[in-house]
């Protein structure tokens, strides 16, 4: 439980599982009103997904670390990584605006969702943190949250098991309607396990892609709902070697079907992109 306690302490101190300059999380936003009843909620996932690999290296030493504060100034996303994350979030924001969706953004006060506590099984810590975030949203008068990644979406929905969370949670996919492809040809989609198997979003983004002008390449073992592989990302804090092995296998499976591999999750991108060029949904459509 040392790791869970350390993560929870960091959430209380920094508002994130590990120390980070909050400007990294917020600098993507341009001309979005601050706050409001409906917000776009990033949980700083796209902005920091690449750092999960770095911080996972320190997990075995959690018992010896009283704090990760010393790492804050040493570890940050590369310019290439952060520029890409910002472009994706800006593309998502622009797609929503073009469809008449009105929303605000919490900027530096945006809290992290607590997803890592949930996914590592620290349910007591997650329950306590969920209450803190729920109270924060109530104080801000937030009634609807637009999510941009599956881990955050799942965490928010699980709040209801632990606290009086009554905010409407919707994925940005569900608000897009028709989209147009930015590219031509064939693509293969790597499904997020959460979106596909637990949250019922698989056909939402797949139908958008199908109607956008690209051709989805399918395989009954590689891309079907019940047979497709995980990217390996969620297990990285527990078993880094196994996580990377799974990612290599998955990348090989996907690129045999198409060179154009598309993901719908920043963590999937972070884990698979070591082994093949990966595109995000919001880089493929507009």
Language-model segments: what does each one mean?
Residues 44, 113, 193, 231, ...:
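Short cysteine clusters
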Residues 112, 154-158, 270-274:
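Phosphate- and divalent-cation-binding pockets in alpha/beta enzyme and binding domains
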Residues 165-187, 220-229, 276-286:
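Short, flexible loop segments at boundaries between secondary-structure elements
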Residues 183-241:
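Redox- and metal-dependent alpha/beta enzyme cores, enriched for Fe-S-associated oxidoreductases
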């Amino acid at each position: 439980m040392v790791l869970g306690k350390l993560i929870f302490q960091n959430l209380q101190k920094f508002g994130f599982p590990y120390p980070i300059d909050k400007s990294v999380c917020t600098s993507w936003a341009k001309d979005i009103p601050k706050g409001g009843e409906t917000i776009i909620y990033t949980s700083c996932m796209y902005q920091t997904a690449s750092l999960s690999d770095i911080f996972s290296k320190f997990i075995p030493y959690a018992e010896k670390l009283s704090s990760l504060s010393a790492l804050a100034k040493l570890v940050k996303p590369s310019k290439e990584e952060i520029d890409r994350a910002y472009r994706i979030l800006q593309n998502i924001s622009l797609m929503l605006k073009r469809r008449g969706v009105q929303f605000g953004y919490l900027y530096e006060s945006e809290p992290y969702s607590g997803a890592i506590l949930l996914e590592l099984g620290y349910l007591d810590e997650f329950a306590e943190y969920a209450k803190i975030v729920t109270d924060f949203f109530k104080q801000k008068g937030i009634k609807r949250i637009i999510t941009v990644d599956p881990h955050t979406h799942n965490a928010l929905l699980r709040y209801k098991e632990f606290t009086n969370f009554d905010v409407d949670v919707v994925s940005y996919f569900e608000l897009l309607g028709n989209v147009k492809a930015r590219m031509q040809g064939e693509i293969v989609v790597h499904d997020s396990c959460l979106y596909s198997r637990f949250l019922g979003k698989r056909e939402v983004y797949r139908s958008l892609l199908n109607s956008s002008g690209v051709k989805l390449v399918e395989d009954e073992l590689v891309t079907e709902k019940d047979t497709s592989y995980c990217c390996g990302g969620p297990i990285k804090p527990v078993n880094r070697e196994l996580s990377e092995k799974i990612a290599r296998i998955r990348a090989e499976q996907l690129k045999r079907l198409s060179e154009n591999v598309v993901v719908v999750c920043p963590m999937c991108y972070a884990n698979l992109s070591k082994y093949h060029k990966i595109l995000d949904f919001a880089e493929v459509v507009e």
